[in-house]
């Protein structure tokens, strides 16, 4: 990168994450799944080894482990997604803003990414209201990119800050993978997904090269 490019390049100012309160050991999840998938191909000892070789010791989920033992309708799971995704996204966003020395009113654009639930209006609208963003703060919802969402969101935030060098952009990604679990789905793919994914949120603040200094002293944990 040339010195001229460096002077005009956007900056990633801060990063923060948030996880739900329920932490579960991989051994706990394995035992639960073995019981639920008993008698199916996915519940065989051979396939259950995916839990042992995942490299994961502990994950966070948004509900107690026992909650997943009961059948849940899509409406119930999605309503919980909206509630929990908003809470986690807001927690990560507030932490990222604090680390950047910013208030929500300093933001010019909010980019929100998720794939594990749906909402209309989309959650970027709910999040902007919850944070207290200015009415003219623009929003971009991105849905359905799965594991690629974080990279795509950062690219979008960079493009926005490059187009408006004075802009401050908040990007928030939230996934509640546990709420997509269907206990009646005995397919191997459901087993593998259950062995890998969890719930959480991440937020970053990206700003253009000409963004004014933050109104507060950035907090570095």
Provide a role label for each language-model segment.
Residues 108:
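Active-site metal-binding motif and surrounding structural segment of the metallo-beta-lactamase
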Residues 1-83, 177, 183-221:
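Condensing-enzyme catalytic core mediating Claisen C-C bond formation in acyl metabolism
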Residues 74, 111-112:
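Membrane helical hairpin/interfacial module
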Residues 2-7, 79-83, 87-94, 98-105, ...:
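Acyl-thioester C-C bond-transforming condensing/cleaving domain
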